[in-house]
A protein has these predicted regions:
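N-terminal cap/leader regions of alpha/beta-hydrolase-fold enzymes
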Residues: 1-147
């Protein structure tokens, strides 16, 4: 089965609407994801109305989903210094594209490989990087969302 980004964006749009309308939900809905989920977090920020903030971890969407001219939500990106799947040059290009459109995109690069947050993967996991990325994520969401 192949991942369908367009369908995932439809589902994400419905999820955001549900969360905002739910009695225990809130108006400040944010999104995060890892790897493909990180790519989806950026794609959703660019294409799903109503998201308040985004925190992608080591993932980038296809260029056709990058519509930063519509974005008002800030982003905090976490990427590995050495990542064969998501090279730093591509990350920098996306960050520059976002910033050129006036989007706040804070970006950090960490030791470890693709999946540096994933403890069960000793080849990529990097404990200090994982903790720092998590601490930055919590601080970011406290500043930009109802956490």
């Amino acid at each position: 089965m192949q991942f369908q980004t367009d369908h995932a964006l439809v589902v994400t749009t419905a999820a955001v609407a549900f969360l905002k309308s739910h009695p225990r939900g809130g108006q400040e809905v944010s999104i995060t994801g890892f790897c493909l989920g990180g790519a989806m977090a950026i794609a959703a920020i660019c294409n799903v109305p109503g998201l308040h903030a985004g925190v992608p971890f080591y993932g980038l969407p296809l260029p056709k989903y990058l519509h930063f001219d519509k974005v008002r939500a800030p982003l905090l990106g976490h990427f590995a210094e050495t990542d064969a799947h998501v090279p730093a040059e591509k990350v920098q290009a996306v960050v520059e594209q976002a910033r050129a459109a006036g989007v706040s995109f804070e970006c950090h690069f960490y030791q470890g490989g693709h999946g540096f947050m994933r403890k069960p993967d000793p080849q990529s996991y990097h404990a200090e990087s994982a903790q720092l990325a998590w601490d930055r994520t919590i601080a970011f969401l406290k500043r930009h969302a109802a956490v």
